[in-house]
Amino acid sequence: MPEEKLRQKGIVLPEPPKPIGTYLPAVRSGNILFVSGMIPKIAGQPSSPKGKVGRDLTSQEGYDAARLCVLNALAAAKTELGGLDRISRVIKVVGYVASAEGFADQPLVINGASDLLVDVFGDKGKHARVSVGVAELPGNVPVEVEVTFEVKGSETGADIEADHVQENLLKEAEQKTSARRRSRGPYRKAAI
């Protein structure tokens, strides 16, 4: 049981992250749950050192940031599904590492995400994976991780309730985006 394994390890899931744009933290399609890219946040604030791995952070700090990204992904999955026990396996992890020039240990950094998933789900936590070095990530965070899960069963009352939560989050994000656009004033086209 994933939630029991987290408790045994003394790991408490953070509050599910709120979207910072017009998207949902997680979307279910049939028996597949797609979790949006998660950054290393606690209580809505980036928690790890910022910058590029290999310059501003060590590989170990990047590894720790990737673990926190997965904890946020698990929190989003739990909100969407009503519990982590509904996850039957981890399908894929995609990890983005803001990398200094010449840094080539992205797979070691994203092992932070993979290792935690295997610790929590055992063999069902083993997954396909992509580790990519990028120039920059939103908010100057060092790592972003997205996860795809296979889930058990059909939609339940918890799923329907989660849909309402997701709809409210999306409406809230759209309102914030619209308010930001209005506060910036009209955009002007440059003369060519």
Predicted regions: what is each one?
Residues 1-192:
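Short, polar/acidic, helix-capping and beta-turn segments at strand->helix junctions
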